[in-house]
Regions:
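Aromatic- and kink-enriched transmembrane "portal" helix at the membrane-lumen/periplasm boundary
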Residues: 20, 49-52, 56, 61-65, ...
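Transmembrane-helix motifs of polytopic, lipid-linked glycan transferases
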Residues: 70-90, 120, 124
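Membrane-proximal stem/loop segments at transmembrane-domain junctions that anchor or position
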Residues: 211-334
Length: 473
């Protein structure tokens, strides 16, 4: 079947090029923190414990980031190979291979981040679930099932705050095994299984590994309470002076002017927001949300709109500059020909087509994919495209709860899931996208028109919260 298909070598080439370009594995301060935990075997939950524990096991073979680099790059390119083999007989299936080399996917594929593990692992699980066919040898089916369970258990706990995305992909996975079961039963099974995944993860983290519990949620609660403090005209956090809150308002941190005020307080040296009492912060936040519900909604929408930005603005963080940040752990990285080439490749696209690194572009693109997939849900019986697109939207939209700057990793899965949702749609679509829109019913045409206008003109109607105006009031 595959004779005369030299393109089958492309995923292998992509794997080798990725390993070479990112060798020994790019590392930011977050990566270095996790590696330090893996070395010392002293874990805390500020970063996913399961990832640090896996790293500590890899260190028994080869110390450093290289084993983790191989792990995450292999998950991605193995997923590409599996999907391509399953869709090789489709017209234009080569599109799948070509788009797998997209700069917005490759640019951070070799950075040792939980976000990359999450995205590569999810894509591999989707690939395994797609068009599932059982092996003739029963033992092989058992091995595949076992590996899939371990994989989904890992990715569910490597980014546990994305539980809605996990729930959707879990449904896709369960559906691939239980196609004859009613939808309601599969939804219930997915929900129970997802809860079980997180339950096992919590038990492993705090009972088996005995990881130290941190208060990362404090950062977002402090941001909320700074906003409410400005509304009230006094500090709602007794440990933080009101004047210090006001002093941090004009600062632009990671291109954000609304979120990340806590970071300004921390770098001042006077405060450590993670040491504040979480329960007290939470109680005060709840009271203020009840008192100022509309103001809180407006603030969150404004901050989310600021995070989304515009699709013509060049993203500030789509490449880990320097490869490996300076450290005392003895890890160094030197650019080679492939590193330099990949950076130039990413830089060129980020300059000429900046929208491919924009959260706004992937938010709206995922909505386009959802609408197209929904129209074809009776044809695509597995609903793979629809589930991928929905997960892409939810992954991006969850940043409304609180996010850093528009760092590409924070919507990496959204970019990957949307891309492969559209690829699968194209492979299964007998007509062009223009034909799909043309033959849509009136409500769908209206939706397309509104979506296009909003996308082109970037009408951000909620982006009007200004801290300085609030102070003047």
């Amino acid at each position: 079947m595959y004779k005369g298909k030299p393109q089958l070598l492309l995923p292998i080439m992509g794997w080798a090029l990725s390993i070479t370009a990112f060798y020994p594995g790019f590392m930011s301060p977050d990566s270095l923190n996790q590696y330090s935990q893996a070395l010392n075997k002293s874990f805390n939950d500020h970063h996913p414990v399961v990832m640090a524990v896996l790293w500590s096991e890899f260190n028994k073979l080869v110390s450093g980031p290289f084993p983790m680099l191989i792990f995450q790059v292999t998950m991605y390119w193995l997923a590409i190979g599996i999907i391509y083999l399953k869709k090789i007989e489709k017209n234009n299936s080569i599109i799948l291979i070509l788009l797998s080399f997209s700069p917005f996917i490759l640019s951070i594929l070799g950075v040792i981040w939980k976000d990359v593990h999450f995205a590569a692992g999810l894509l591999l699980l989707v690939a395994s679930s797609l068009d599932r066919k059982k092996f003739k040898i029963r033992f092989l089916n058992i091995i595949v099932l076992t590996l899939e369970v371990l994989l989904i258990l890992y990715i569910a706990n490597v980014r546990g705050n994305s539980w809605l995305v996990i729930l959707l992909i879990t449904y896709l996975w369960i559906n691939s095994y239980l196609k004859s079961v009613t939808t309601l039963k599969k939804i219930c099974a997915s929900l129970i299984f997802t809860i079980g995944l997180f339950g096992v993860g919590q038990y492993f983290t705090y009972q088996v590994v005995k990881a130290k519990q941190t208060s990362i949620v404090n950062d977002y609660l402090v941001d909320n309470l700074i906003y409410f403090s400005i509304l009230e005209g006094e500090s709602l956090i007794p440990e933080i002076e009101y004047d210090d809150m006001v002093a941090c308002l004009p600062a632009t941190i990671a291109e954000m002017k609304l979120n990340l005020r806590f970071f300004c307080l921390n770098i001042s040296g006077k405060y450590n927001t993670s040491s504040l009492n979480t329960d007290q912060l939470l109680d005060e936040s709840k009271q203020m949300i009840v008192k100022h519900p509309w103001a809180f909604i407006k603030y969150k929408l404004a901050a989310f709109s600021e995070f989304q930005g515009t699709f013509w603005h060049k993203n500030y963080y789509y490449w880990q500059t320097g490869g490996v940040d300076s450290n005392t752990l003895g890890i160094e990285q030197t650019d080679n020909f492939f590193t330099i080439s990949l950076k130039k490749y990413s830089d060129t696209f980020a300059t000429l087509l900046p929208f491919v690194f924009s959260p706004l572009f992937w938010l709206w693109s995922s909505l386009v994919a959802v609408t197209l997939s929904w129209r074809r849900r009776n044809i695509d019986t597995e609903n793979v495209s629809l589930i991928l697109a929905a997960s892409a939207f939810l992954y991006n939209f969850q940043n409304i709860l609180g996010a850093g700057g528009p760092d590409f990793r924070y919507f990496y899965w959204s970019a990957i899931a949307t891309t492969f949702s559209m690829i699968l749609l194209k492979l299964n679509m007998p007509h062009s996208l223009a034909h799909e829109i043309k033959t849509s019913s009136a409500p769908w045409k209206f939706f397309w028109i509104v979506l296009t206008i909003v996308f082109i003109f970037q009408v951000q109607i909620f982006h009007h919260v200004n801290y300085l105006d609030l102070i003047q009031k």
